[in-house]
């Protein structure tokens, strides 16, 4: 959020919270909540989500870390679900694209995960769960093997290694969706809601 005025332009943050059960055949009315704050600090979503229990699908912003139940020393009722769109984007950053041949491996495998999701979007929970177990789980295992094997051959400072470590450090949160029919592969619903609000 930009707030032009006198002198330097002030910036703020628009936090977006979305509920949309349509992809898993839920019947709750979709809803979007926008909260504006003058700064982007983790304490803001902590305040917004005080008392919330459940799954939070978000990007890798470090300010969210204190929200999650598995954070060191924290005992909250919020479980992290990471976003595959953010992870996939790492392989399309220009410094990583210079290693284009190696980037095809994860990009193709992540694309296959999205194909599984395309087939189950809007389907009943049991069908989504079965399809993910049959089709997504083996692809996740294959991708994890590729990431581990490739990382072991790279310089730790390479941009591709950084992209891989981003995903591996979030692996439990990235793969959580595959075991829960009510979760999505990414948080693109929030991205779409943000785009509608800012255009």
What residue ranges belong to the model's regions?
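Catalytic center-proximal scaffold of phosphoryl-transfer enzymes
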Residues: 1-199
